[in-house]
Amino acid sequence: MKTIRTGMMTLAALAVLGTNVVSATSEPVKELSVNVNGQHIEQAAIFDKGQQTVLVPLRDVAESLGFQVKWNAETKAAEVNKGAIFSYAKVGEDRYPFAKMYKTLGAEPRLLNGNTYVPVAFVDEILQAEVNVTDDAVTVVDEESDVAPVRTGTITTLNKREDGGVSFQLNGYETGIILHVDKETKITTADGKELKPEDLQLGMEVEATHQKFMAMSMPQSGAVSIVVKSGLETPEVLGTAGKVASIDKDQEGSYKMLVEGQALAENAPEKVALIVGKDTKIVSAKDNKELAPEDLKAEMKVFAYYGPKLTRSLPPIGVAEKIVVE
């Protein structure tokens, strides 16, 4: 039996979050995006508060994994079949055929908006695929697929070459990966709008899938798909990566942080003083967890992003839009 990995937020924490989806019992549930073998699935997964588990749309997920799915009107069950694997999901029954016996998964299928939803454990234990669950996404990977699971995080460095090629670093130096973008890479916004490689910017939060092969030095791979979840407000993003030389809090509650290191954009300084306020987004490169200004300390390694409006002083002073902490 493989293990379903759950990161960033426990199922108990998911239970307190609501969304606009309505279940068969009219109880609000939490929506999660679904990605199978690098491809986004339009039908969202949901968190079933009553059963304390995530449910995924059976047909969309199973068919994306190469299974045949059909509805058996006589037994009132959704059947799945691929090779030696046959099973079914019947609403109201925690009982699933597998390898000439029955398994219980601790949760029952649900019928929502005319679609059969199954516990995420069904994908792992019955469909035999690798599953990763975070606070807002379910990633499914067929063990035979050449696509690695989705990585979510921030574009910390960005290299746009004269030949039109683009490569970027996701989530910093220590825990990140370098992804190469080519004409085959599918780039979209979260609502499905197509983007071009040149639309990528420093500080963007993205979901990226890549090929499983990676170089032996710092991990590098070709990006298969990129979904831009959010970007910074300024159209021209500057950035500086380095150590926090100092950070001080003023009487109004804002922080002033001095960063010394490497310029990440053509017009960016290597040394910059940044105002860190309530609108500054601060995240950890390791797990994308949101941090507070008071979590910033001297000597921390950071990637700081800001707009082009800087004072003419030395060092120049600006307003931090986003900070990624290594």
Swiss-Prot record:
Pfam families: Cu_amine_oxidN1 (PF07833). GO terms for cellular component: extracellular region. Sequence repeats lie at residues 177-208, 272-304. The keyword Acetylation does not apply. Residues 1-24 form the signal peptide. Shows inhibitory activity towards serine proteases, such as trypsin, chymotrypsin and subtilisin. May form a trypsin-inhibitor complex in a molar ratio of 1:1. This is Protease inhibitor. Thermostable at neutral and acidic pHs. Keywords: Protease inhibitor, Repeat, Secreted, Serine protease inhibitor, Signal. GO terms for molecular function: serine-type endopeptidase inhibitor activity. It comes from Brevibacillus choshinensis.
